[in-house]
Amino acid sequence: MEAIKGSDVNVPDAVFAWMLDGRGGVKPLENTDVIDEAHPCWLHLNYVHHDSAQWLATTPLLPNNVRDALAGESTRPRVSRLGEGTLITLRCINGSTDERPDQLVAMRVYMDGRLIVSTRQRKVLALDDVVSDLEEGTGPTDCGGWLVDVCDALTDHSSEFIEQLHDKIIDLEDNLLDQQIPPRGFLALLRKQLIVMRRYMAPQRDVYARLASERLPWMSDDQRRRMQDIADRLGRGLDEIDACIARTGVMADEIAQVMQENLARRTYTMSLMAMVFLPSTFLTGLFGVNLGGIPGGGWQFGFSIFCILLVVLIGGVALWLHRSKWL
C-alpha cells in the first residue's frame, strides 16, 4: 500500500488525529508526516462536525460505499471487507449521565494496515481506556492491536453493564421473597434493557468471531486468538442475558400472583367486615323506619340499652367468625 501524506488526513475539527509510534504510544499527526504500515494513523471524527463531514464526503482515501456508513448510515454491528480495507460497525454502552446506558452508542471504523478512521456522534466511553493506554505508552503498536484493544474495551463495558443488570435481578428476587413489589415500570425497564443488549450484542459477537476467522493481512495469529477470546467472553455475557430475560418472565408471574393474593386478602377482609356489621345495620335500619314510633323512644335508657345490644351482637358475630376460623 502506498504511503499517505499527513496533510491528506489532518482534519481541522477532528476529535483527534494521532500516529502510532510502534512502541505503544502516539504523537499528534503533522502535515509533514508520512503514514504507512510501520507508522499507522488513527483519525477519530465526529461526523456531524462540518469539516469532518466534508472530509468524509470528498477524501479519495475512502471507497465510495464507505462514506455513507461512516457518516452515520450504519447502526447494526457488522463487518465488511472492501478490498484491502475493512468496514466495521460496533455498539457500546452509553456513558452519558443524561441518558440510559441501554441507549447504545454506535461507532463506525474503516481501517487497513496504515489508516484507521473511526467516527461517532455521541462519546464512546470505552475508547477512553484505549486512549489512556496510548498516552501512557502501553497501548497497541499497530492496526491489528488497536482493533483488538478497542473490542476488548467495548466488551469490558458491556460485561460490567450486564453484571449490573444481573445484580438488580437478584435484589428484585430477594424483595419478592419478602413480598415487596417493585415500583411500577421497574421490571419493564429492566427487561427492555436486557432485550436491547441482546439485540445488538448478538451480532457484535458474530462480528468478533468473523474478525477472528478472517485472514486480515494486518492482524497476526496472536491477535486473532485474542479476538476469538473476546467473542467467547461476549458469548458468555449473552448466555447471562438470556438467563436474566427468562428470570424476569418468572418474576413478572410472581409479581402478578403477589398482587392477586393481596387483592384477594383485602377483598376477604372487607367481606368479613360487612358480615360483622350486617346484623347491626339491619337493626338500626329497622328501628329507623319509625312507622309506628321507635320502640323505647320514650324511655331514658332506651338508646343506651340499644347501643349495648348492638355491641353484644357485633361481638357475638365476631366470636362466631373466629371460632369458625374465618377470622
UniProtKB/Swiss-Prot annotation:
One of its GO terms (molecular function) is solute:proton symporter activity. It is a multi-pass membrane protein. SUPFAM superfamilies: CorA soluble domain-like, Magnesium transport protein CorA, transmembrane region. The chain crosses the membrane at residues 273-288, 303-320. GO terms for cellular component: plasma membrane. The keyword Kinase does not apply. It catalyses: Zn(2+)(out) + H(+)(out) = Zn(2+)(in) + H(+)(in). Residues 1-272, 321-327 are cytoplasmic. InterPro entries: CorA_cytoplasmic_dom, CorA_TM1_TM2, MgTranspt_CorA/ZnTranspt_ZntB, Zn_transp_ZntB. It is found in: Cell inner membrane. Keywords: Cell inner membrane, Cell membrane, Ion transport, Membrane, Transmembrane, Transmembrane helix, Transport, Zinc. GO terms for biological process: zinc ion import across plasma membrane; zinc ion transmembrane transport. It comes from the Bacteria. Residues 289-302 are periplasmic. Coiled coil: none annotated. The keyword Transferase does not apply. NCBIfam families: PRK09546.1. Belongs to the CorA metal ion transporter (MIT) (TC 1.A.35) family. Uses a transport mechanism that does not resemble the one proposed for homologous CorA channels. Homopentamer. Zinc transporter. Acts as a Zn(2+):proton symporter, which likely mediates zinc ion uptake. Purified ZntB reconstituted in liposomes also binds and transports Cd(2+), Ni(2+) and Co(2+). This is Zinc transport protein ZntB. The lineage of its organism: Bacteria, Pseudomonadati, Pseudomonadota, Gammaproteobacteria, Enterobacterales. The gene is zntB.
